[in-house]
Amino acid sequence: MRTRSIVCAVLAAALTLTAATGCRDSRTGDKAGAAGADNHVSIMVGGIDKVIYLPAKLTDQLGYFKQEGLDVKLLTEPAGAQAENVLISGDVQGVVGFYDHTIDLQTKHKCIESVVQMADVPGEVEMVASDKAGQIRSPKDFKGRKLGVTSPGSSTDFLTQYLASKQGLTSADYTTVKAGAGQTFIAALENGGIDAGMTTDPTVAQLVSSGKGKVLLDMRTEEGTKAALGGLYPSTSLYMDCGYVKAHPQTVQKLANALVRTLKWIHAHSAEQIAAKMPADYANGGKQLYVKSIKDTIGMFNSDGRMAPSAPHNSLKVLGSFSPNVKGKQDTVDLSKTYTTRFVDKA
């Protein structure tokens, strides 16, 4: 885990002097927060250019955070496990990442809750190198293979372990490789660093278009997710420390208002219109390919920020089947403390 001092130094270098005050402990706040409102918010995104986390940057691009009176600084950390560490240390006030971290952290006696649940499917795709596609036809063929995940302890790691466990395999039966995302993932698949791996758009679209990779399992849709995981698996969320949520309800409400407004905007516009609002450098594989990646993934987002009632239970079931942190502790997890709809209900 990064030390708090290191993270603060990084934030101070990346942000303006005023924004760097986000390094104060998010769980206690300051005088401005005593009244329940603190309009300066730092949010870590688990890969800001990933389409599965598109609502975060799109909200900023549309100006909805500012219209709520918020000064939001979006930071990026491709590995979800590292993003949660920065939240726990108090150096950011929220994370846009997978919901499953709230369950995993509760078993470590940390209270983290999703305040806006933007998707009930992972949006992840298990890709296989084209020259290995004839040998790896399903997760049962993972044995002896090098499998790429964003990083150990990330949601891609969780899901990979679960897919393997359904075939009677454990993580000892294959080699887990930290492959990151984007160009690092593509390079790993191309040069043989991994045989298969889990990633998202726009990386998926680039691999398929170039012929370097083929889709093995597609969890960008409800149908594909249920086939792979036996039910819904909530992913993209804004999760925050419970103490911060309790101390700053006005700020959290404003964040929910902005994000839900974006979700509704997404459902009212085409992939082309969405792509046009995003930073040009997000389309580093080409504009048409970026539009396709949005079109292939955008259906994962809901329009209201609410959690599907059955989804948390399936996440707990998945984690409880293999995760050393959760396995055997399922009965101690209080799912009602891992998410709330009270803010999106008012948005």
Language-model features and meaning:
Residues 54, 62-63, 85, 89, ...:
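Solvent-exposed, polar/charged alpha-helical surfaces in well-ordered, non-transmembrane soluble domains
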Residues 184-187, 191-279:
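Pocket-lining segment of extracytoplasmic ligand-binding domains
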Residues 313-347:
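Conserved C-terminal helix/tail region of periplasmic/extracytoplasmic solute-binding proteins
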Residues 67, 134, 138, 220-231, ...:
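Short, solvent-exposed loop/beta-turn-alpha elements that line the ligand-binding surface or hinge
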Residues 50, 77-81, 150, 154-155, ...:
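Soluble non-cytosolic domains of exported or imported proteins
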Residues 245-325:
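Secondary-structure end/capping motifs
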Residues 1-40, 347:
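Short, low-complexity disordered leader/linker segments with a strong preference
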Residues 29-170, 175-179, 195-201, 212, ...:
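Short, glycine-/small- and polar/acidic-enriched structural segments
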